[in-house]
């Protein structure tokens, strides 16, 4: 055992000595500024400098259907140009085959309310119970640094059928795509189809950060509070009675396919004369139309009573966002880039062109910032 261990010690020592000897010619002196020894030849290389070119390209229309949110409004940015955003959406009834009343003659519509929440954050709750909010996801011009300039919105019943599947696809069950330029990729969507009947005009709308307080009509007490939102009543109650209530027991309210073919959706069109407004990202999955109605029971008897009820049409169906943007695309020779979202613009840098700088060690490169 002693002889074997001694042999191992000699063998290990031999390899260590050989290792030091083989590395002797690879040593190089390292100074504070880097390797300076002429033996470190592997660290030398040549380089070239090229002109970097920049340009801005307008994006093609992008797919904009089946999203949980929507953009609405108009806005003019002095750097990027003007934006106008609108959308059309399907509706989803809160209940199919509804029974509004045993006798529709005893039913009266009280209110029909459009409710579309803004995105907002709770800041604090006061002792009075009022919640203070801060609005989120809104861009635009503020008047006197206080509030955004207002916009006008017209709400139409749409006669355009939004398909779930693409009939021109080579495979079954391929989803239909719709684009920001009012098209499905093959044909355009006409305003005539989108504007079947005007239902509501919302004038001088601006994003108010205050909570919505729902009050009792008899004693004016607060019975409900809602986060900041578009909250507007429809004037034409007879339209909703004919369109929805009187379809009780009919096939139009039997299932979602029948309903979408019957009531094809709502089109929200920005009708402001000025482009100095705002654009809001709205939470359409939480938006709805609420039909508030009263039903009389035991009419003409001593037990006659009135029951308050509601029926909701949610704006959570398939929707298409439309963008009509007039962007300021900068001159591609001015070494600037303009990058904008939606179907806006992208910046492109050409890093390795064929054109080399004549004096590769000249650091006076073009300023593209």
Task: Give short role names for the model-derived ranges.
Residues 2-369:
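Secreted, disulfide-rich extracellular signaling modules
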């Amino acid at each position: 055992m002693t002889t074997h261990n001694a042999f191992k010690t000699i063998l290990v020592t031999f390899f260590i000595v050989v290792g030091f000897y083989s590395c002797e010619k690879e040593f190089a002196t390292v100074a504070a500024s880097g390797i300076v020894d002429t033996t470190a030849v592997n660290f030398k290389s040549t380089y070239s400098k090229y002109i970097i070119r920049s340009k801005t390209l307008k994006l093609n229309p992008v797919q904009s259907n089946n999203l949980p949110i929507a953009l609405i409004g108009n806005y003019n940015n002095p750097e990027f140009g003007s934006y106008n955003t609108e959308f059309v959406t399907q509706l989803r009834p809160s209940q199919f085959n509804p029974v509004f009343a045993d006798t529709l003659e005893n039913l009266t519509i009280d209110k029909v309310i459009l409710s579309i929440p803004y995105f907002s954050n709770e800041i604090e709750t006061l002792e009075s119970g009022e919640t203070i909010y801060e609005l989120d996801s809104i861009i635009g011009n503020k008047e006197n640094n206080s509030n955004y300039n207002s916009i006008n919105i017209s709400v139409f019943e749409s006669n355009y059928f939004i398909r779930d599947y693409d009939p021109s696809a080579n495979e079954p069950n391929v989803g239909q795509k719709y684009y920001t330029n009012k098209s499905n990729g093959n044909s355009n969507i006409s305003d005539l189809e989108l504007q079947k009947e005007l239902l509501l005009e919302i004038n001088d709308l601006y994003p108010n950060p205050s909570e919505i307080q729902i009050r009792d009509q008899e004693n004016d007490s607060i019975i409900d509070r809602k986060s900041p939102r578009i909250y507007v009543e429809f004037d034409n109650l007879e339209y909703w009675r004919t369109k929805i209530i009187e379809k009780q027991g009919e096939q139009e309210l039997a299932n979602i396919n029948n309903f979408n073919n019957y009531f094809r959706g709502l089109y929200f069109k920005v009708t402001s004369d000025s482009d100095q407004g705002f654009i809001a990202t709205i939470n359409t999955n939480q938006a709805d139309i609420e039909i508030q109605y009263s039903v009389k029971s035991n009419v003409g008897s001593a037990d006659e009573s009135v029951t308050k009820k509601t029926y909701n049409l949610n704006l959570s169906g398939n929707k298409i966002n439309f963008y009509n943007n007039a962007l300021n695309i900068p001159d591609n020779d001015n070494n600037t880039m303009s990058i904008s979202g939606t179907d806006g613009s992208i910046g492109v840098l050409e890093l390795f062109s064929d054109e080399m700088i004549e004096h590769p060690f000249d650091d006076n490169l073009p300023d593209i910032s």
